[in-house]
Curated annotation (Swiss-Prot):
The gene is cpfC. This is Coproporphyrin III ferrochelatase. One of its GO terms (molecular function) is ferrochelatase activity. The lineage of its organism: Bacteria, Bacillati, Actinomycetota, Actinomycetes, Micrococcales. One of its GO terms (biological process) is heme biosynthetic process. Pathway: Porphyrin-containing compound metabolism; protoheme biosynthesis. It comes from Leifsonia xyli subsp. xyli (strain CTCB07).
């Protein structure tokens, strides 16, 4: 397996032998930090697709609305500091390096720093919880590309923590947020009965339907049965939404999984329904208020600020709905602790039976399965921390 440690280079789904990692690689998406950065950043995001700058400028307006600055970099700086503080509080000597896929500091910068400091074994934590090409395999491909670009293949090995969609550290902040949102609605509109007048909308990034169908391995880990519509990506979100709904409301408030931030030509099918379309349908069902849960996101980055806090809130107002948006995990203490626990899980080779997961789909694989999360348009490229292809 390209670029992985020997412990992760076998065919086992989970690694249960200790690995002496030298550092943590916090792998982010990246974002512009000024107006002049916006178009170059979007060129990086869309590299290889042949998208003209005129089309990129349409998306750029979302960033320009906020001064050309994406909040994601400051959020990752805060997460890096929170991880370092959590590690220090436990007496764990693991430096945290930070590198992005699409903007400074790049993954190649982090690998160069690792080499300069004599680090040879890195455990990566990507800022994405679910299984799909863009949220898992593309990170692994970018690790491989950065190793090639820096000439560090064979000198630095990179493993990656499992997808943590159903880890308590990721899920519990959402449960807490929904509970708080229900209370907020009770205070703001006591006349609205939660069971009949409130709807929870769990929102995540839409992806092409063909890519969704290729997300995850070929069958469900809990039953071996084929995935339904939307593949592992949709199934993971549905499973987590069910847990959050049950734990936060006892299942008394209805909910939907909705999608946002789609791009690409209208002729290409993407996962639906769009959150704004669903919002427009709710008044006819007697819904008076909604709770928006950004279930697919780890921090309040541009897709949350624009697509939810701007567009979805405008849709809610246009349709006469009271709306509350739940926070993302961000630097919530449970989330930060959970990420460190995931690192230690791999460092110590924790037995699978001792690994926490809140759905029957987990704990997810340490080593990605062959053919996992194919990009149908681009095909397979070299990737670390998973089996070929």
């Amino acid at each position: 397996m390209l670029g992985a440690t020997p412990a992760a280079a076998g065919v086992a789904e989970h690694v249960t032998e200790p690995v002496a990692y030298d550092a943590i690689l916090l792998a982010g998406f990246g974002g512009p930090e000024g107006q002049d950065d916006v178009i170059p950043f979007l060129r990086n995001v869309t590299r290889g697709r042949g998208i003209l700058d005129e089309r990129l400028e349409e998306v750029a307006q979302h960033y320009r609305h906020f001064g050309g600055v994406s909040p994601i970099n400051d959020q990752n700086r805060a997460l890096k500091a929170a991880l370092e503080a959590e590690l220090a509080s436990r007496g764990i000597d693991l430096p945290v390096l930070w590198g992005n896929r699409n903007w400074d500091p790049y993954l190649a910068d982090a690998l160069t720093e690792a080499d300069q400091r004599g680090f040879t074994k890195l455990i990566a934590v990507a800022t994405s919880a679910y299984s799909s090409y863009s949220s898992c395999r593309q990170y692994r491909e970018d690790f491989a590309r950065a190793l090639r670009e820096t000439g560090l293949e064979g000198r630095i090995q990179i493993d990656k923590v499992r997808q943590f969609f159903d880890h308590p550290g990721f899920v519990e902040p959402f449960i807490e947020g929904v509970k708080n949102a229900v209370e907020e609605l009770r205070e703001r509109a006591p006349e609205i009965h939660p069971a009949t007048g409130v709807r929870i909308l769990f929102s995540t990034h839409s992806i092409p339907s063909t890519d969704a169908g290729k997300s995850g391995p070929s069958g469900r880990p809990d039953s071996g049965e084929p995935w339904g519509e939307g593949g592992a990506y949709a199934a993971q979100h549905l499973a987590v939404a069910e847990i959050v709904s049950h734990e936060a409301t006892g299942g008394t408030i209805g909910w939907d999984l909705v999608y946002q931030s789609r791009s690409g030509p209208p002729s290409m099918p993407w996962l639906e329904p769009d959150i704004n379309d669903r919002i427009a349908e709710l008044p006819e069902l007697g819904v008076k208020a909604i709770i928006i849960v950004p279930l697919g996101f780890v921090s309040d980055h541009m897709e949350v600020l624009w697509d939810l806090d701007t567009e979805a809130m405008e849709s809610s107002e246009e349709n006469g709905l009271l709306a509350v948006r739940v926070p993302t995990p961000g630097t919530h203490a449970k989330y930060v602790k959970g990420l460190v626990d995931l690192v230690l899980e791999r460092r110590d080779g924790l037995p699978v039976a001792q690994r926490p997961s809140l759905t029957t789909l987990g704990p997810w694989y340490d080593v990605c399965r062959p053919g996992c999360c194919e990009n149908v348009r681009l095909g397979f490229k070299p990737a670390v921390a998973g089996l070929t292809p």
